[in-house]
Structure formats: C-alpha cells, structure tokens
A protein has these predicted regions:
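Non-heme Fe(II) oxygenase metal-center motifs and adjacent flexible, charged/small-residue loops
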Residues: 1-210
Length: 210
C-alpha cells in the first residue's frame, strides 16, 4: 500500500521509540514554561499512521462556538490508557517513566490534508492541574506547530515530521496557546496527544537547552 505522503527515512517497520531520547532539546518559552522536542523519536511512524488511519473510530465533532454550531476541521478519536492499540499504550508507559507523571488519556487528531487545522487554544487540563504535561507524537506529513504567549508577544514555531515528539510543560497550558494552522500543500497527518489527570511533580528531562 502506498502512503498518501512522502515516507520518512525510518518510517517503515514496527513502531519503536528512542528510549534514550537522544535527539531531545528543550526550548525555554519563559521562566516557567518549556517545550521539549525530540526529532525522529519514533521509528516505524509510517506503519503506525497506516494502522490508525485505517482502524481507529474517527469522528468529526460539532461544537457550539460563539452562538453557532461549528464542525471541527479534522477527525478525532480518543482512548484511555489500557484500551488503546498496544503501540499507543507502550508509548504512554515510556513517556510516563520519562516525565514522572501517569499519562492516562490519549487523544488523536487526524488532519486529512492541509485544509484541516486546530485554532489557537490551551488544553482544558489547565483547569484542573497547575503544571500539566502534554506530549504529542506526530505521524505522517510535515506540519508547523506554533505557540504564542496569552498576553501577546513573540511566538515560537516548530516543524514536526513523522516520528517527532513534542512535550509542553511547566505553565505552558496556562500562559501560552498553541495551534496547527492550515497548510497550502499539507498532506495527511495524525497527532497522538497524551495527557494526565492527576497532579505530579515532573522530573526535569535532561537534554540540550536552546
């Protein structure tokens, strides 16, 4: 089966994460917010993309926004850890061990092409946790991922390829917003997002700081 996007160099084969996080770099957004990025963290990312694209129970949600119904420009699917496909549960375990929190929910967004997107927002987990960690594994086509401070100011942009890992930590959900904008020639992409529901003190993740 041919993939609907340019295959990545290490995209074939069974999904396997880099347990050493050898490519991880930390970007300090401000004194209390940070982002970790680990390029090519997951090998076999194209295999996992195909599996999820063909078997997950994708749904297109409709939401009430500013007094009108809006159809989300993407497909979504969610699991609790322990009920998701085995590769996703395995990644949850690795990330939990690394960051010292119990990731217990998984949410996937399927951007079918460059017209699908997600607007600027902070994850709702910020309403229940002081310093939530949100981990994202990117599959499929390359897309831009942006962050901007809520009070205004310069933002930060990252380009995520299939197999890349991005983790937002500190007060990033409270003080920053993030987005995946439309892309004129964007191909299909799936993002796998891991969240935790209980407060925990995350261990500092070793890595080179920008």
């Amino acid at each position: 089966m041919s993939l609907p996007f340019q295959p990545s160099l290490f995209g074939a084969g069974n999904p396997a994460a880099d347990k050493m996080y050898s490519t991880l770099r930390r970007c300090q957004l401000d004194d209390e917010s940070w982002v970790d990025v680990a390029p090519a963290w997951l090998s076999g990312a194209d295999t996992l993309f195909e599996e999820l694209a063909g078997s997950a129970a994708w749904d297109q949600r409709e939401r009430w926004i500013h007094g009108r119904h809006v159809i989300e420009p993407r497909l979504t699917c969610g699991w609790t850890v322990g009920t998701s496909p085995p590769p996703l549960d395995d990644l949850a375990t690795l990330l939990s061990q690394r960051y010292g929190v119990a990731f217990d929910s998984i949410w996937a967004n399927y951007y079918r092409d460059g017209r699908d997107s997600v607007a600027w927002h902070g994850d709702r987990v910020r309403f229940s946790l002081q310093r939530p960690l949100v981990a994202i594994v990117s599959l499929g086509s390359r897309r831009r991922f942006g962050l901007r401070p809520r009070g205004g100011g310069a933002g930060r942009w990252f380009t995520l390829d299939g197999g890349d890992l991005l983790v937002m930590g500190g007060r990033s959900q409270h003080d920053w917003e993030h987005t995946v904008p439309k892309a004129a020639h964007g191909g299909p992409r799936i993002s796998i997002t891991y969240r935790h529901s209980r407060e925990s003190v995350a261990r500092p993740a070793p890595g080179t700081t920008d």
